Structures are given as C-alpha cells and as structure tokens.
Amino acid sequence: MHHDPASCAGDHESPLDCAVREGGHALVEQLVASGVTRVFGVPGESYLSVIDGLYDHTDDIEIIVTRQEGGAAMAAAAHGALTGEPGICMVTRGPGATNASIGVHVAKQDASPMVLFIGQIPRDHQHRESFQEVNYRQMFGELAKEVIEINTVERVPELTVRALNAAVSGDPGPVVVVLPEDMLVEQTDAPLKSRTTPAPVLPDAHSVQEAHRLLSEAEKPLIILGSTGYAPELGPLVTDYCGRNGIALAAAHRRMHLVDNSSPAYAGTFEFGRSVLENNADEADVIFFLGSRPDPNTGEEWENYRGGAANGQAGPGVIHVYPDPNVIGRFFPAHVGTAASPLEFMRALVEHEGGGSGDGGAAGGGAGDSALADARRAWQKKLHDDWAGYIERNLQTSLGGPFMQKFNARFDAETIITNGAGNYTAWVQKNRTYSTFPSHIASQSGSMGYGIPAALAAALEHRDRTVVTFAGDGCFMMNGQELATMAANNLDVLVIVVNNSLYGTIHMHQEREYPGRPVFTSLDNPDFAALGAAYGARTAKVSTPEEFDAALAEFASAPGLRFIEVVTEGY
C-alpha cells in the first residue's frame, strides 16, 4: 500500500520544502500522510506538542481518549488484529508507559501490528533517575519488535514511517517510539516521507513443490491456519483447497473466525488442554502450519513430534510457512520451512496443483490413487464430525451451553464477539461456530481485561455490525472503566459479564493440584448491573438461560451500551 503525503510532500530522494513547525506537529502530519485514521491514548504533559498537533487534524484522525493506558494499548493491539494495519497508542512517560506495557505484550504474542508512542523526559535530564524516567530500550527490549528513540527533530518523519513499516513487516507486532519532550518542541522543516509498506514475501518454487509432494502423499494431512500474514481472501482460498483435496483444516488457538466452520474440511480449533482435535492431530502424518506458530496451545507438545524433535529430526511431514524466518524451526524441525506470505504461498500451491479436480484433487491422491483419496476423505470427515459432536456436547452439557444456545439463536454470523481470559471464554469458543472474518477477536496471550478494549476497537472500526463482548467477573474488573469510553463515543456494544465470584481458571487449577485447599481465588464483587447503569448502560441481571434469553430479546437490536450480568455457580 502506498500513501502519499497530502502536503509538505517529499521523500528520501527529492525532499520538498516544508513550513517550519514543532516536531510534535511534524509527527502528526506524518501519521496523517501515512494513512493513520485513529489513535488511542491517555494524554500526558510529556508529549503536549503531539497533542497540540492533533488539534489541527481532528478531521483526519479520530482521537479515542481512554481511561487507563492499559485499555488504550489493548485497543490498539485489537485494532491491529482487526485491520492488519498498526494500531496507534499514545501515552506519557513512566506510569503511562508501564501501564501500557500489557498491551505491548498482547500485541507481541498475537503478532498484531501496533505502534506505541511514549513521551519522554527531556534529553538533558536523562540518566539521572529523573522524575518518571525509564530506559525504554531496556524495558521493552523483550516485548517489542523494536524500540526507536527520536533524538533529532529532523528525523521525526523518517523514523515514524520506519516504525509503522516495522510493525507490519515480517512477524507483525509492536514497535515502541520514544519522544523526548524537548525534541518535540524544537522547530523543523523536515519533509514528510512517502510510506510504501513492505511487499509480501513470495515463496520459492522448491518449497511449493515439496509442500505439494508431502500433502499429495499424505493419508492424514492437517493444515493449521493462523492469523499472521492473514488476508480476508486467504480463508476461502485455503478452505476450498482443503475441501477438494481431502485435507483437514484447523484454526490456531482463538482464531476460529479464519475458517468457515461449516465447511466439511473444518476440523476445529486448538485450545487450552487436550480436546478431540488435539487427540486427532496426534494421528496426522503431515501437518502444515500456515501463518501459525506452534505453542503449548497449538501443537507444540504433540506426542508424535517429541521423539523426532528431541533427536534433532523432523517430525512426520512438518511444513511451516510464516512471514518471519526466525520463527521457522523454533519449536521442531520442518521438512519444508519457508519465510513467505501465507496468502502468496497458498496462491502458488493452488497454481502448482493446477486448480484441483476430481476426487481428491491434484493433491489428493498423487497419481490417481483412489484408495488414498478415499482414506483422505474419511480422515477429513472424521475430524469434522468429531469436532461438530464436541461442540454439540458442549452446548448440551457445559455450564455455558444452555446460555449460548439462546445467544446463538439471536446473533448471526456477522456479530463480532470479543473476550479476554478465563474459563468463561469456553462459552464462545466451545459453544459457537464462526463463518465470517472478523467475527471473533481474542488474545492468544491469555491476558485478562482484553475483551472490553477489543470491543471498543471493533465497534469503532465496524459501526455497522453488532459487537458483543464477554467477560468474567475478574476479567471485567481489569478494564471495565473503558465502558466510559464506549459511552463517550456513542458506541453500540453489548457487554455480558459471567459472574461466579471467582478467579475461576486459577481455582480450577488449584483444585486439581491442591484439592480441598482453596485460597486467594474468591472474589467479593460489586453490583455489576448497578455499575453498568452508572456508565449509562441499560442493564439486566439474570441467572437462568430463560432469563438470559429474555434480556437478549430486549437488548439484541437496541442501540447504545447494554449490559447483562449472568450470575453462575461453578467454573
């Protein structure tokens, strides 16, 4: 994507004269020229020049003032997940930056593009432990892709573009930009830079050929689709490819919306612990990680890979395609490992296949082996049916199942659902199917408090769609203050808080590891319905599926902020 500065234009080769302005104003101009349309943040005196620059561009950039920096940073991370473009967050030094660090961690683990701008103490105050001083290169060295401190005002446009591009290149993620207060108020006529985002990395022909061979020869092939390098057209492309070739297709942890769950190829999604999908995946003879990173929730510990990986040998038929070469082979060796755009790799694979035809397609039976094609079809059907049965059993027997039956009947596939972390997340992960991207925004980092800021980002980006956020009682209290931000921006969001008066996930682990010794996990909660009303929401408090359904009937299509507290027992 190419963004041309609207004014004060220039590039590295042919800079044009610009009006003299403060460094903070130049930064805002560069953001506008680079296509940024929204920023999240909490104001601070350390970057007042940037804030003043925003005053001149309120028609270009939507300013979302949040109530805590952690909420702002998580919303920015969610924006990156929703759009593929960097979410922008602005905070002040010291406490502002430390509060925002949780969102940087979320963006890193989710591979979500994000740029965090931090006001900094003046340059001549540094290295004295001055008021609110932090060394951000040290603080964010492990959390961010890159930490850039702009110490020369003339480099503001250049380094701003560099940060935006770094956030989306390779393995997408967070970039931190540090802005010394005195630098921001210096005058500069530095020209703006044209931003040309990095082109996708094309696959090499040998890797495509080898991947095709492995998939063609496999009896039980499985593709695991992740969101890194994801484009909306990738989901239908890989689903169609798997469908005609007898390949099972799974979604990485909390990435169900990448695949139409109704497809006969869909095999389920990976989650905490072992489900029917993990058990089935142990039998796969070829596994293709496509834009996904193996981790404890997406296949890192599968039994059939441990022996080979421990001996330094590739496990059975591992293919790994990921935009960043540093991720390839990090978890276990791969027969085919290549740094490439997942979309471009799939396009090349389909082209190599010749489009596929007949039973099993070109990748479905090698040289027309009907027995192999039949075996692949049976494998694909088994995984699809096993997962469908798993979802149905959850709907009938799990704590959240009866409630989600009511929810699913009233909210269609266009609904965007967000959640944070906790046992309540099983309500939307194990009791609902997805078919539209984006329709489920959740963090792979296991960060409580993510769902509310993610809903804020989703409602701003998709004002024409229904947005529902689920939170546990513990999870909600981490960032519930952002309901005030939703109300201030007149957003239509339904908030559902599942209240069991526990940090339920930890209590569950505690009972398993140290049975009969509960401590440190019970919660004395406020009146959530009253709290929601204080934020201006219409509220309801329910405890049965029937009461829940009645509240949904009232709130489902109503505008504005709505809040349902669901009182439950158990976890």
Indicate residue ranges for each PLM-predicted region.
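Active-site diphosphate/adenylate-binding microenvironment
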Residues: 24-34, 42-45, 50-55, 378-462
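Thiamine diphosphate
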Residues: 117, 126-132, 265, 269-272, ...
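Phosphate/pyrophosphate-binding active-site segments
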Residues: 2-18, 154, 213, 314-421, ...
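Glycine/aspartate-rich loop-and-adjacent alpha/beta segment that forms the canonical ThDP
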Residues: 2-5, 183-204, 297-298, 303, ...
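Glycine-rich, acidic loop regions that bind phosphate or pyrophosphate groups
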Residues: 8, 118-159, 255-376
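Glycine-rich, anion-gripping cofactor-binding loops and their flanking helix/strand elements
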Residues: 81, 227-319, 433-464, 477-481, ...
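A short, small-residue-rich loop immediately preceding and capping a beta-strand
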Residues: 37-40, 61-64, 82-121, 224-227, ...
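Conformationally flexible catalytic loops at phosphate/diphosphate-handling active centers
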Residues: 11, 162, 166-217, 355
